[in-house]
Amino acid sequence: VIRTAMALLARGGSIYMVLAVCLAVPSHAAPVAWKEDMVCGKDLNRPDHQPGLAQRYVVTPNGAIAYYSFGQGSPIVLVTGYRATISNWNAYFLGELAKHHQVIVLDNRGIGGSVSETTRYGMADLARDTLTLIWTLKLRDVTLVGWSMGGMVAQTLLMQHPDRIRDAVLMNTAPPGHGGDAVPADVMRILSGSPGTTFGQVMSVLFPPNAEKQAEQCFARDMFKPADYGSVRVPAQVAQSQDALLGEWAADKQAFRRLRGIKVPTLVLSAQNDAVLAPANAAALNKAIPRSSLVEASDAGHAMMYQYPRALAQRIIKFIDTSL
């Protein structure tokens, strides 16, 4: 990068040309070490305890999409992962974001109050649902955050409809095609809720070994659980549909090549001890997306927002504040 920049200057190039070269190159620093911060429900100042917080809906051609909105500032839209509900977000992570931004979390189609009129759909359909929510709410300067499968939805939206997105955060996710590493088969069996799967097994794939015990005690207490949300289960048909679209995503080589067309500033977040989607996936995304930066958290697992809710949120806020 330095050689290219110096060559441009030597040939009479402007400082703006040099900056363009530097900004277009993915960046990656050494892993960051955050202080463990599982709250375990002890702090009652959390967004899901706010009076008047209520589930709302937008109408899409496929049916209603349910969401919650709280906080003030430029909007952050968060898309969750495989077989996940709104409750799988960490309440304190969302609360930290909401100190500076409007936070919108939604359920993917077929989950909770979000409707699915069809049983077969692809990543583009989930991206279209998110886009419809953004359009309907007339959001501007949106930061799009996708976790795990939600990061794949976010990539799809960025490739197809980037005009409403100011910047993006891809957290513990994977690129399409063969650009990264697949979820290990034994891990997928646990995440898919195979018969006999225990809560402890789920925690063992979401957290590194030294955090498992505390996660078993704190995970449910730190979940985002508004009073009107209730106990939401993921229907078997939705799980099967998501299995199918994940398979299609992994086979889509054309989409991987289209990642280079993403022009918005993108923060790629990775967990060093992610047993679900290995850090190689984040490295591949960082290499493929021109205006991306990579932050890897040491001693962190797939659900690292539960280990470091405030530090992770603050890193995202810093990215939003400094992105062009």
Predicted regions and their residues:
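Active-site loop/oxyanion-hole signature of alpha/beta-hydrolase fold enzymes
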Residues: 110-145
